From Swiss-Prot:
Cofactor binding description: Binds 2 magnesium ions per subunit.
Cofactor: Mg(2+)
Binding positions (substrate): 22-26, 38, 66-68, 70, 72, 189, 195-197
Subunit-level organization: Homodimer.
Highest taxon above the source species: Bacteria
Name of the molecule in the record: Ditrans,polycis-undecaprenyl-diphosphate synthase ((2E,6E)-farnesyl-diphosphate specific)
Function of the protein: Catalyzes the sequential condensation of isopentenyl diphosphate (IPP) with (2E,6E)-farnesyl diphosphate (E,E-FPP) to yield (2Z,6Z,10Z,14Z,18Z,22Z,26Z,30Z,34E,38E)-undecaprenyl diphosphate (di-trans,octa-cis-UPP). UPP is the precursor of glycosyl carrier lipid in the biosynthesis of bacterial cell wall polysaccharide components such as peptidoglycan and lipopolysaccharide.
Name of encoding gene: uppS
Family: Belongs to the UPP synthase family.
GO molecular function, one term: ditrans,polycis-undecaprenyl-diphosphate synthase [(2E,6E)-farnesyl-diphosphate specific] activity
Binding residues for Mg(2+): 21, 208
Family annotation (Pfam families): Prenyltransf
Gene3D superfamilies per UniProt: Decaprenyl diphosphate synthase-like
Amino acid sequence: MEKIKSAGPSSVPRHVAIIMDGNNRWARKRLLPGVAGHKAGVDAVRAVIEVCAEAKVEVLTLFAFSSENWQRPAEEVGALMELFFTALRRETKRLNENDISLRIIGDRSRFHPELQAAMREAEVRTSGNSRFVLQIAANYGGQWDIAQAAQRLAREVQAGHLQPEDITPQLLQTCLATGDLPLPDLCIRTGGEHRISNFLLWQLAYAELYFSDLFWPDFKHDAMRAALADFASRQRRFGKTSEQVEAGARA
């Protein structure tokens, strides 16, 4: 990742979420092992971080490893864990150089203790950075996220600190893994698939969806800028009519 340059203000989402799909297919197309696609995908991560930071996006959430990905071949899962561990150690310095804070969301209990320690260390080492938040979803699933939020609230009710009727969508949202961050405005999926695959199910309620046919390793600077330009061209109505939105913009 290069030293990130500043850019002027532009019409961009506060929070971008990305499903990084197509690493294996990228590798197969080149007659390479699947892990080669995941390694190549790291360059795309760096490129997207650079574009988002330049454009003044506040939060970038990357779907790195879903709770369903444990079902993949053991060799691939092992290679992904090793790559994740290496990237945490290697990229932390670059994140600090660019004032980027790292957060990791998901159920960490299945990860090796050494990897869990590396996650905590990277988060602590970047916690003082304030320019931009890079959030990695690892062993994450949207259904898991909603369930763990409901469990937290149920414990509060059980302890007598909360009444069932006190539970509102707003309160439940604060208990999600992303609770204190703005909701995603834009969700991008690469690889040509048109689904969200159990990613941020609650949080994506009003997000704009953008699908790219590019495999993730090929989704670099120009592709990310194109996605942001497409977002800027859309009118977000949130249930209102176009006339209401336009009138509100003029007010």
